[in-house]
Amino acid sequence: MSYRTYISTFKFVFIDECQDLNAAQRELMLCAAKGGRFVAVGDRKQAINGFCGADCLSFDKIAETPNTIELPLSVNYRCGSNIIKLVQEIVPQIKAYENSESGTIETYKVLSKSLFHNGDMVLCRKSAPLVGLCFKLLQNGITAIVKGGDIAESMLKLINRANCNSINDLSKWIDNEKKKTATEIAEYLNVGLDKAKKTKRYINLADKLDCIKNICVSQLTDVTELKDYIQKMFDEKSIKNAVVLSTAHKSKGLEADRVLILTPSNFPMITKYSKEWEVQQEYNLKYVAWTRAKKDLVFIDMSENELNNAELTEDNK
């Protein structure tokens, strides 16, 4: 940072979520606190943004700054004690507040209308299952939105790139695009198609394409109607009275009385190509997702294929 001398300094500098700072942000913080003090709040086990440039060791590097004192914040005041017991399998040192409610943990293997209530938060490791479920909820008269305008933007860009008029042609284009991408990766890495489909590049693109594929159904007449439907699904103006669906990454900092985890088997999402820091952050993400629930944590234990083929029943039986 060649402009260090131009950075204003302060007697006290406060920084939140310090585990997700990148190198430049951390240097800026230290420059601003030069001659003063800084208070950094964070959690090593909530470092989940390495994929977008955060320094995975940011918390430790701040803690190792000369004259820095590290204090624990191990008591969780949000989650019920039963939820914390489950979370301790991931982060053993976390403790429940002594006066916290017990909380409930439930598991379901079917989708039903009665399973979803206004104000619920539904979390998933990937975007495509969320989009598919949101479509089912809307079709059954349940107000629901997917959190994340960037997901809608990426879907619309792919649809425009496909340049198709009919839903059927778009669906075929998606299948061909996935095959084309897998082949390109396989040739580049000199591996088979199965291994190519386990790479981050393929998984990320396939997730975006599957977001579109999951709502390419007969009820929609053309691509223009599909685009309008996508805008509706991601309209956060109705968030107060809706079932809110979100990726685990976007749920960071949020909470709800009742949280449903969609396809929990995707936590952690690890392949043989995952680096050590990526593996750690996948477990961190699982910890973040499980601890969004204040009272009730519900697991919808269905595979992505089962979710795609499932219809919403009237009850949980």
Region roles according to the model:
Residues 93, 311-317:
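Short, electropositive alpha-helical surface patch
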